Amino acid sequence: MWALRSLLRPLGLRTMSQGSARRPRPSKDPLRHLRTREKRGPGPGGPNTVYLQVVAAGGRDAGAALYVFSEYNRYLFNCGEGVQRLMQEHKLKVARLDNIFLTRMHWSNVGGLCGMILTLKETGLPKCVLSGPPQLEKYLEAIKIFSGPLKGIELAVRPHSAPEYKDETMTVYQVPIHSERRCGKQQPSQSPRTSPNRLSPKQSSDSGSAENGQCPPEDSSAGANRKAWGRDPSLVVAFVCKLHLRKGNFLVLKAKELGLPVGTAAIAPIIAAVKDGKSITYEGREIAAEELCTPPDPGLVFIVVECPDEGFILPICENDTFKRYQAEADAPVALVVHIAPESVLIDSRYQQWMERFGPDTQHLILNENCPSVHNLRSHKIQTQLSLIHPDIFPQLTSFYSKEEGSTLSVPTVRGECLLKYQLRPKREWQRDTTLDCNTDEFIAEALELPSFQESVEEYRKNVQENPAPAEKRSQYPEIVFLGTGSAIPMKIRNVSSTLVNLSPDKSVLLDCGEGTFGQLCRHYGQQIDRVLCSLTAVFVSHLHADHHTGLLNILLQREHALASLGKPFQPLLVVAPTQLRAWLQQYHNHCQEILHHVSMIPAKCLQKGAEVSNTTLERLISLLLETCDLEEFQTCLVRHCKHAFGCALVHSSGWKVVYSGDTMPCEALVQMGKDATLLIHEATLEDGLEEEAVEKTHSTTSQAINVGMRMNAEFIMLNHFSQRYAKIPLFSPDFNEKVGIAFDHMKVCFGDFPTVPKLIPPLKALFAGDIEEMVERREKRELRLVRAALLTQQADSPEDREPQQKRAHTDEPHSPQSKKESVANTLGARV
């Protein structure tokens, strides 16, 4: 492996898939399902198979999301944080999603939309249509603040006032619903606050009725008359989805019995007629359609409705569209999906409204009272890691609402991840794909791995013989790695986030990628509110989506936690590039009031030598240091995108933690982090991919380790691994007793420094199969490059061609075996 790499260096060639040596990607063709759709043409008839599947069951850590499948189309209803990760883990194809329906402009509904759109763009999907509140268009514009131009995918918004949508599977009608509380008292998370310490919302012409205190008109056209772009928390959009009628099947055997010309061209118009329900006349006989065709499958209806609070109950109950379907016998409602808290479900008005759909309608409930494991692979790997060290790798838990579930008189099912309701071919609930988090099976699987138990026993013996020094055994600071993967959330590793617990009641969050709150829920379970209340500051290193799109949910959930525990609200200190302000402002203007949650400190103001003339900023910086008990909170620009920062936290007790963010090896980071107690450095790529690392402005494992050595860091934790290393990265020869690798939900303190490097042998045993596959892939890539290098060298040496041609005439032909030996000898000589 290393010999192959050394062969390439004197030839001046790149190893593996580096830089310009990589084959350029071919231009993306239309996706296969789009080509199939074009061939099929219009009017294929209703689909044979249609089902709804729960992606997220409405829990606090996952939100509520539904996936709808037919052989023609795929749909997604709501896209909160973590939905993309769940779809990837459970093999629900993202590439087929050309329609996303959103019930309201709330972070629990749209928090994962940015990442989802970027992924759809990468798959080559040419167009995606989003239906829901009109503010969607402004939300998409806001996303471009940090995503850049979304070239390659057309994003269209279908506001609730648009006509019905129709495709090969169904017709979808949008039903706008306005809360009766829209002029009254707002919910806590929507109530404006003012403070000189906080970002002040700008009054703009597009700020909607909530900004100027004007109440919208009370007539039925209120939604259409209010300003299209302003924040409107009183609006939700329900969706009534009617499947196309599926024609009956032609009975071939019956047709033969009746003497019809089966197998000839003459049968085609007969089939078309009877499938349309028309009788035919053949050789003087009239034959009814029912004799030759099974009954058609009616166009069933399903409804998705969100009722966030009691203020929406009366508008829902009095809505004329729902009344029509409650009385419609020709279009039976098979299923109603209720995204509603228990406070709504126990209301007698809402229960009576549910009952009016009749006894044949099923009801699916999605809310916080739906206990369901979603991230099964994360639970599995954490259970197996805990066999090695249960303190460093604690078992995951879950947050469940303590509120009792309502007793309802209608046929009701509580949501759980991957639960299906099939509409065609047969109406039924299907639980064969739901998740079973069986920890005993996970443990048994690990214990059966070759040498795993032996390596764990050897590791424990080694740790007992070499305990941590007494001065390092303090519990704090405690580092909890919440997301250790790069780019996009995946089933094993979530995107960037690290919690630094400074003390039992103070903590700092270093980056906050999508799904950070969900990771906190799974790590702390019922203690999540306490943890959120202890959060004193967040550092955002740069504005790539995998580093900051979890921030809004942290802010909203933190306010909920403070209220739940009866603690006074204070804005959260956020150290970030100033460009984050524009994103927060846009979201505040068009979705939810958020600015009162934040006291922002520009990261550039914490650079060494930076002058801060603003007295408000001076006070915020002093508050940051005082609240976190820090002597210094310093930042520096790093080598990644524009406005990317690393940071160093120096505690009053003397320890120093340095966080690189995303960067190539950076001298400014080395200088800022001199003599760090702990360096947390990104190691996105394996050794040998140095030029790819330059292209993507990241570091390899050895580069990250070298930064720590030059910094004289006491210990180095590597994280932010490419998702190609799903479970474990490839190890570098530079790994030593001062280096550890991070996993999601890994928890370390300074006293664990001697222990963490000793984890590597049992980790290698646990992931031996994965490591072997990665090594094989690397060696194959390198061997291909070696062969290409030899061919290139021969082609570039014209003076050698004539002797080679002469030898070709005199040498005896080589057997296949001798050719292999010749190549091997050549490689050996080069090495």
Swiss-Prot record:
* Transit peptide, residue positions per record: 1-16
Q: Where are the transmembrane segments?
A: none
Q: What is its EC number?
A: 3.1.26.11
Ranges where the record places region Disordered:
15-47, 179-227, 791-831
Q: Where is composition skewed (Polar residues) in this entry?
A: 186-212
What reaction does this catalyse? Answer: Endonucleolytic cleavage of RNA, removing extra 3' nucleotides from tRNA precursor, generating 3' termini of tRNAs. A 3'-hydroxy group is left at the tRNA terminus and a 5'-phosphoryl group is left at the trailer molecule
Subcellular location per UniProt equals: Mitochondrion; Mitochondrion matrix, Mitochondrion nucleoid; Nucleus
InterPro entries associated with the record: Metallo-B-lactamas (IPR001279), RibonucZ/Hydroxyglut_hydro (IPR036866), RNZ2-like (IPR047151), tRNase_Z_dom (IPR027794)
Main subcellular localization, coarse class?
A: mitochondrion
Required cofactors, per record?
A: Zn(2+)
Highest taxon listed in the record's lineage:
Eukaryota
Q: Record's GO cellular component, any one? A: nucleoplasm
Question: Which keywords appear in this protein's UniProt record, sorted alphabetically?
Answer: Endonuclease, Hydrolase, Metal-binding, Mitochondrion, Mitochondrion nucleoid, Nuclease, Nucleus, Phosphoprotein, Transit peptide, tRNA processing, Zinc
**CDD domains recorded for this chain?**
RNaseZ_ELAC1_ELAC2-C-term-like_MBL-fold, RNaseZ_ELAC2-N-term-like_MBL-fold
Residue positions of the PTM Phosphoserine?
191, 195, 200, 204, 732, 797, 815
Instruction: Quote the SUPFAM superfamilies the UniProt record gives.
Output: Metallo-hydrolase/oxidoreductase
Q: What does this protein do?
A: Zinc phosphodiesterase, which displays mitochondrial tRNA 3'-processing endonuclease activity. Involved in tRNA maturation, by removing a 3'-trailer from precursor tRNA. Associates with mitochondrial DNA complexes at the nucleoids to initiate RNA processing and ribosome assembly.
- Provide the family line: Belongs to the RNase Z family.
Annotated protein name in UniProt: Zinc phosphodiesterase ELAC protein 2
Q: Which organism is it from?
A: Mus musculus
Name of the gene this protein is made from: Elac2
